[in-house]
Amino acid sequence: MAVAAPGQLNLDESPSWGSRSVDCFEKLEQIGEGTYGQVYMAKETETNEIVALKKIRMDNEREGFPITAIREIKILKKLHHQNVIQLKEIVTSPGPERDEQGKPIEGNKYKGSIYMVFEYMDHDLTGLADRPGMRFTVPQIKCYMRQLLTGLHYCHVNQVLHRDIKGSNLLIDNEGNLKLADFGLARSFSSDHNGNLTNRVITLWYRPPELLLGSTRYGPAVDMWSVGCIFAELLNGKPILTGKNEPEQLSKIFELCGTPDELIWPGVTKMPWYNNFKPQRPMKRRVKESFKHFDQHALDLLEKMLTLDPSQRISAKDALDAEYFWTDPLPCDPKSLPKYEASHEFQTKKKRQQQRQAEEAAKRQKLQHPPPHSRLPPIQNPGQPHQIRPGQPMHNAPPVAAGPSHHYAKPRGPGGPNRYPQGGNQGGYNPNRGGQGGGYGSGPYPQQGRGPPPYPGGGMGGAGGPRGGGGSGYGVGGPNYQQGGPYGASGPGRGPNYNQGGSRNQQQYGNWQ
């Protein structure tokens, strides 16, 4: 298979389509699971190469191959860049898949399965950040952010919107390379068409205000809002906009970024859901006040990323030229970063769940079998006064029957205290101020919740709770977005007309424009 040079589109060649069987791979461990299937770490039996197998779930598809998988494959075969995940090939299972007992898996009795084969990455950003005691240094944060922006700039130049930027979709290997993954919600766009796009994209905590207000014409600026949320999360040590539903998410955005009006965001009052969500009272912008402990250059860049008006939001190209990346401490060389044990969000969630179950079982055991000298109150019948003979001790009173154990909700919160203190320059790497070439996340999407019915059709189901949790960065755990309506190319917004201006950028991004 021909491979395009870095930064160039490869439109003529496609990955191997079903020419090999999944039996060529040995599944080693599940690293993701979600709405669209499972992701496994696997080994190619002939070469011993470690890869990631993303199984495309077919049992719920009545009309053939899932549209999200088709879209992801078509886009990934075009994109070849060191900061974008590589789709290596497509493989199939020849017959119905079977469980460990050899029985056909329910819903797959008469079908085979299709797998997408990706390069394996050791971590996703959320799984890595959630490791106990993890503390990112400032040069490390700059290194990750520069790679994220470089990969996203490449996508936007080639007219691709990612539309699901979040920590679990940013994959990192043990060489420090970061890659964009999960293009299941990605779309091609064109600046000269004003087609309608769905606004039910991007995980809720990272969704920009224009989508929450009902816009169906948008461009690369939607991804840049998500990048701003990731940036603030890395610096702050926890997510910054944690709404439980669309109205609450917009409320949190307005509390931080101020109330939009025609002066600061022309056209906002004409957006479909503006009247449903406009705040009762005006609020001032508080980004600088809320994050005054950030470095000044970091704060300046964050302000430009979290701009309410998408037409004024900074582009990926301009963000790469921000002073933040060119002042001490400089971004470190990815290869200088420490190596960590594999950390995917699916695995860290699973470990926390197992720990909670063990603690719950220990509590239950303690209640059912108290120590021999424990002093538990005696059981009394309803309305029966407690009676005891004078001088008789109560040491051997009958134990209380154990009730049901406490219910523990699934966790999804900030990963503890600030993990990211101001650190020194660890390997201030800056040869010619060049850009760094360049990571899967996992876990189920929490339920979005429903709110009042400003949307057509009444409901307000959206792109799911906390960090979007979700499946793996290979794309298994996307939310249940409804893709209704004709989706053409995007309309207004920051178009793809990015020129490689500025001396800082001329050698940074290869030979693509």
Curated annotation (Swiss-Prot):
<feature type="modified residue" description="Phosphotyrosine">
    <location>
        <position position="36"/>
    </location>
</feature>
<keyword id="KW-0547">Nucleotide-binding</keyword>
<dbReference type="GO" id="GO:0005524">
    <property type="term" value="F:ATP binding"/>
</dbReference>
<feature type="active site" description="Proton acceptor">
    <location>
        <position position="164"/>
    </location>
</feature>
<feature type="compositionally biased region" description="Polar residues">
    <location>
        <begin position="497"/>
        <end position="513"/>
    </location>
</feature>
<dbReference type="GO" id="GO:0005634">
    <property type="term" value="C:nucleus"/>
</dbReference>
<protein>
    <recommendedName>
        <fullName>Cyclin-dependent kinase C-2</fullName>
        <ecNumber>2.7.11.22</ecNumber>
        <ecNumber>2.7.11.23</ecNumber>
    </recommendedName>
</protein>
<keyword id="KW-0723">Serine/threonine-protein kinase</keyword>
<feature type="modified residue" description="Phosphothreonine">
    <location>
        <position position="35"/>
    </location>
</feature>
<dbReference type="InterPro" id="IPR008271">
    <property type="entry name" value="Ser/Thr_kinase_AS"/>
</dbReference>
<feature type="region of interest" description="Disordered">
    <location>
        <begin position="336"/>
        <end position="513"/>
    </location>
</feature>
<dbReference type="InterPro" id="IPR050108">
    <property type="entry name" value="CDK"/>
</dbReference>
<feature type="compositionally biased region" description="Gly residues">
    <location>
        <begin position="485"/>
        <end position="494"/>
    </location>
</feature>
<dbReference type="InterPro" id="IPR000719">
    <property type="entry name" value="Prot_kinase_dom"/>
</dbReference>
<keyword id="KW-0418">Kinase</keyword>
<feature type="modified residue" description="Phosphothreonine">
    <location>
        <position position="198"/>
    </location>
</feature>
<feature type="domain" description="Protein kinase">
    <location>
        <begin position="25"/>
        <end position="325"/>
    </location>
</feature>
<keyword id="KW-0067">ATP-binding</keyword>
<feature type="compositionally biased region" description="Basic and acidic residues">
    <location>
        <begin position="336"/>
        <end position="348"/>
    </location>
</feature>
<feature type="compositionally biased region" description="Low complexity">
    <location>
        <begin position="417"/>
        <end position="433"/>
    </location>
</feature>
<dbReference type="GO" id="GO:0032968">
    <property type="term" value="P:positive regulation of transcription elongation by RNA polymerase II"/>
</dbReference>
<dbReference type="InterPro" id="IPR011009">
    <property type="entry name" value="Kinase-like_dom_sf"/>
</dbReference>
<keyword id="KW-0808">Transferase</keyword>
<feature type="binding site">
    <location>
        <position position="54"/>
    </location>
    <ligand>
        <name>ATP</name>
    </ligand>
</feature>
<feature type="modified residue" description="Phosphoserine">
    <location>
        <position position="191"/>
    </location>
</feature>
<dbReference type="Pfam" id="PF00069">
    <property type="entry name" value="Pkinase"/>
</dbReference>
<dbReference type="InterPro" id="IPR017441">
    <property type="entry name" value="Protein_kinase_ATP_BS"/>
</dbReference>
<feature type="compositionally biased region" description="Gly residues">
    <location>
        <begin position="457"/>
        <end position="478"/>
    </location>
</feature>
<feature type="binding site">
    <location>
        <begin position="31"/>
        <end position="39"/>
    </location>
    <ligand>
        <name>ATP</name>
    </ligand>
</feature>
<dbReference type="GO" id="GO:0106310">
    <property type="term" value="F:protein serine kinase activity"/>
</dbReference>
<dbReference type="GO" id="GO:0000307">
    <property type="term" value="C:cyclin-dependent protein kinase holoenzyme complex"/>
</dbReference>
<dbReference type="GO" id="GO:0008353">
    <property type="term" value="F:RNA polymerase II CTD heptapeptide repeat kinase activity"/>
</dbReference>
<keyword id="KW-0597">Phosphoprotein</keyword>
<dbReference type="GO" id="GO:0004693">
    <property type="term" value="F:cyclin-dependent protein serine/threonine kinase activity"/>
</dbReference>
<comment type="similarity">
    <text>Belongs to the protein kinase superfamily. CMGC Ser/Thr protein kinase family. CDC2/CDKX subfamily.</text>
</comment>
